[in-house]
Each structure stands twice: as structure tokens, then as C-alpha cells.
Design a protein with these regions (language model features):
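A secondary-structure micro-motif
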Residues: 1-129
């Protein structure tokens, strides 16, 4: 369990239970999923948080001054050692900077078409079993 699940477009989630010919996968958009990511353009690090929608993850608690813009790509950072660095994750769609608030809220769309997946790969290179 814990292995990354990846499509041709990017990260899907991670294996939580493995069976002989199947697996239960925690999707990266699940409300309980937190994923260390970085902005490919700036290397700014953040945590992508699932919000329970297949088309969205959010970056929270980023300083209002953070250098992040719509169109920026997010990839795994390698922090936490659960996922290798550099796996494509999502594209920033909106950066919300509320006046007087110290933090920006960033909305990103997963690169993998999570609602339409037909084929995925499980990365066994980090399998500890």
C-alpha cells in the first residue's frame, strides 16, 4: 500500500489496499488526501488538499505574496517521501487574494482526467513489501 497511481497525464492517487488483481485507490481529490507539491516555474512548495470534487484540489495557507499564477503547473515535490519528485499533478486555475487576508487560496485542476480514467499505472519501484 502507498504506491503512487499514475495515468498518462499525471497523478491519480495512491494505493491504500492491494489485492492480488485489484487495489483500492485514494484519489488525490479525496477530502482526506494531502499531497506535497511544488510549482514547476518557481519551485515554491505547498500542500495540495483534496476537496472531494474530481476536478479540483486547493493550495491553502500560502502567503498572499506567493509567486503563483493561473496556468502554473504543480508537480510532486518529493517531501514526505511518499511520491518521487516530478510527477505532474495539476494546473493552477485561480488564485484568490482577499484584501486584508494574509493568505492566498489557490484552486487547481488535476491534469489526469479523474472522472474518465480507463488505464492507470501503479509505481512499484518504491514498494516496501
Amino acid at each position: 500500500a502507498g504506491q503512487p497511481v499514475i495515468s498518462a497525464d499525471g497523478l491519480v492517487g495512491q494505493v491504500v489496499v492491494a489485492y492480488p488483481h485489484a487495489a483500492d485507490v485514494l484519489m488525490m481529490t479525496d477530502a482526506t488526501h494531502h499531497l506535497p507539491v511544488q510549482v514547476t516555474r518557481t519551485r515554491e512548495r505547498a500542500i495540495a488538499v483534496g476537496v472531494g470534487r474530481m476536478d479540483r484540489v486547493e493550495l491553502r495557507n500560502l502567503p498572499d505574496t506567493v509567486d503563483i499564477i493561473p496556468g502554473d503547473l504543480l508537480e510532486t515535490s518529493g517531501l514526505g517521501e511518499r511520491f518521487q519528485p516530478g510527477i505532474p499533478v495539476a494546473q493552477v486555475k485561480e488564485v484568490i487574494r482577499a484584501p486584508g487576508q494574509p493568505f492566498a487560496r489557490v484552486i487547481a485542476e488535476p491534469l489526469a482526467p479523474l472522472a474518465r480514467l480507463s488505464l492507470v499505472m501503479v509505481d512499484l519501484s518504491e514498494d516496501e513489501s
